A protein has these predicted regions:
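Short amphipathic alpha-helix used as the core "switch/output" element in two-component signaling
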Residues: 67, 89-100
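His-Asp phosphorelay/catalytic-motif detector in bacterial-type signaling
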Residues: 73-75, 99-103
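Non-catalytic signal-transmission and effector/linker regions of two-component phosphorelay proteins
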Residues: 1-31, 130-154
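Conserved acidic segment of CheY-like receiver
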Residues: 28-40, 45-49, 77
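Active-site residues of response regulator receiver
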Residues: 80
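Helix N-cap/capping motif at the beta->alpha junctions
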Residues: 58-67, 88
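Receiver (REC) domain active-site loop signature in two-component systems and cognate sites
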Residues: 83
Length: 154
């Protein structure tokens, strides 16, 4: 790859910037599923992660994300918390039943995500920290099946 992309959020606007490849470690190829009701965020996540060699599936709703996870082998899931129809908590519960070994990263622009929702995921990233934390968290989670043990009780 000739360059990598960096995601930055400034004044609520997601920006994509090219960066030299030498600033990022090589990551293992994997299939990632991104679920977010904001199409612009999905496109930025997809471009960013594909620049590192990941195969990225995207879904604008929780039900579409679950449908994709049932049809494809998914190695890791990235889901927004605040979405219409199904929120990230509901998606995480269903995803754990569908893909119990796939780590789940929850994203949110707000920090008031209920503790109960966080029990179903392996990591939480505030959207304003996405640029600096997404790749390190993916790298850590890809090195193990789950970051912490789960009881998976609703």
């Amino acid at each position: 790859l000739n360059s990598f992309l960096s995601l930055n959020i400034e004044n609520g606007i997601l920006k994509v910037e090219a960066m030299p490849p030498s600033t990022h470690p090589e990551l293992k190829p994997a299939v990632l599923l991104c679920i977010d009701d904001n199409e612009d965020v999905l496109e930025c996540e997809k471009s960013f992660l594909e620049s590192f060699g990941y195969t990225v599936l995207t879904a604008a709703t929780g039900s579409k994300g679950l449908e994709l996870a049932s049809m494809h082998s998914v190695d890791l899931v990235i889901v927004d918390y605040f979405m219409p129809e199904m929120n990230g908590h509901e998606v995480a519960i269903a995803m754990r039943r569908l893909r119990p070994k796939a780590p789940i990263i929850m994203l949110s622009g707000a920090l008031d995500v209920p503790e109960q929702a966080l029990k179903w995921v392996d990591a939480f990233i505030a959207k304003d920290r996405l640029a600096s934390q997404l790749l390190p968290v993916i790298t850590q989670l890809r090195g193990c099946e789950c970051l912490t043990p789960h009881s998976y009780e609703a």
